[in-house]
Amino acid sequence: MLVNLIESVYRLLWGDLFTIPLGGGIGISFMVVLLFTAGIWFTCRTRLLPVRLFRDMIAAVCEKKQGRNGLSSFQTLVISTATRVGMGNLVGVVAAVSAGGAGAVFWMWVTAILGASTSFIESTLAQKYRQPDPLYGGWRGGPAYYLHVLAERRRGKKLKRSVVAALFAVSGLICWCGISQVISNSVSSAFENAFHIPPLTTTLVLTAIAAVIVLRKNATVKSLDVMVPIMAVCYFVITVGIVLFNLPKLPAVFGRIFAEAFGLRQAVAGGFGAVLMNGVKRGLFSNEAGSGSAPCAAAAAECDDPVKMGFLQALGVLIDTVVICSCTAFLMLLVPQEITEGLAGMDLLQTALQYHLGGFGVVFIAATLALFSFSTFLGVLYYARGNVAYLCGDNWWSQTVYKLIALAMLVIGGMQAYTVVWDLGDVGIGLMTIFNMIALVPMAKEALAALNDYEKRKKLQ
């Protein structure tokens, strides 16, 4: 019954909202319309921010911590990158190419470029409306908190909780439980292929190690500080090396991506509509722009200007999808199609790495996925802190209960079917995006005003 409910909500969010009568019918989902419309609108309103202010985005990474509490700019980027560069860049890209073909990669790029401006708006608002965190110290915030501010303004009085803000918080907790399932499902599959270890064994070991880390107070950020830079550099160096070694094949890969992106070559069932939907869906899962996840980390940073935190998160979206997701996609697309035909999920990625690096490739991607999975799991639990506190108040029991639920979802995910696991995460992130947009549309003018003020001050320097 629960599976049927998840599938029904999934179809409502990601199923065809309408069909364009071209090439046998192009199905467009509600979420595709929402994300593209918002992305185009915010990109225009910020006057092509990702291009215009790219240098400022780079400079924001080097901002020094302004106080003793909270996170530095680098730590904030690390936490949001942990979830983006974690499962999204491996499992998300694999899922996009498996279901949408090579053309889905192009639509992931488009989603990221448009999403950078959306990420700027939501992260700037999160920084502006953050609150002190009495449990963990520092700051907390995110869409639940600026949705609460919006509700109080419209009602004209103080509220203990807002319905829409609570719905966002619940959707986020559902999404992050879904991501927990994707983590164990993918890692157990990878370890079974690489080392012939039974999925249940891998899942239980993964859960035990995760429990040791997450049930401690502030171990999450400390673990990510060390883990993310090392794993990201290792993965990036090896994948770029493979791409450079296969440089003569890249023009054909780009040709395939663009041909399948616009339906010039039929690659998957459902044609252009399936390519577009899977690219946007997995692009959102990978870079999180507009979903409201990354602002939960942005709110925790010590920063002298909310605009700089917006720059930081916009940069994270571009690093994630345009750079690292592309590397993962190229790993698979540089392999002859007859070798990967009929493969999906981690089987596809591991076969691709085996083609490029031999037996080492299978072991490398399994180990990398395990590290990425830990970073993602720790990252989403960090996101969950403020949302659990918004729903249940400032107490340790609610924080611990959610951590235990997330750990339980790790166990369940390792034994579930691949598609069912993805559907729960997609439902959660879809609902989060809808509730987040309810706040972003009317409150965007505040972030835009802050941006204009920043640019005026910059001219005077």
Give the location of each predicted region.
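N-terminal alpha-helical transmembrane segments of multi-pass membrane transport
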Residues: M1-M87, V97-A104, G115, A439-Q461
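Membrane-interface loop-to-helix entry segments
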Residues: L34-L35, F42-I58, V164, G172, ...
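Helix-loop-helix module between adjacent transmembrane segments
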Residues: A38-T43, L114-W139, H148-N185, S189-I213, ...
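Transmembrane helix-loop junctions in multi-pass membrane proteins
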Residues: R45-P50, N89-V93, C175-S188, A211-S223, ...
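Flexible loop linkers connecting adjacent transmembrane helices
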Residues: L48-S73, A95, G101-A102, S117-L159, ...
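Alpha-helical membrane segments and immediately flanking helix-loop junctions
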Residues: G67-A99, L125-K128, L135-L150, L167-V170, ...
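Selective recognition of specific alpha-helical transmembrane segments in multi-pass small-molecule
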Residues: L114-E122, T202-K217, V228-P248, K281-L284, ...
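Extracellular/periplasmic helix-exit of transmembrane alpha-helices
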Residues: E122-P134, V240-R256, G270, A300-C303, ...
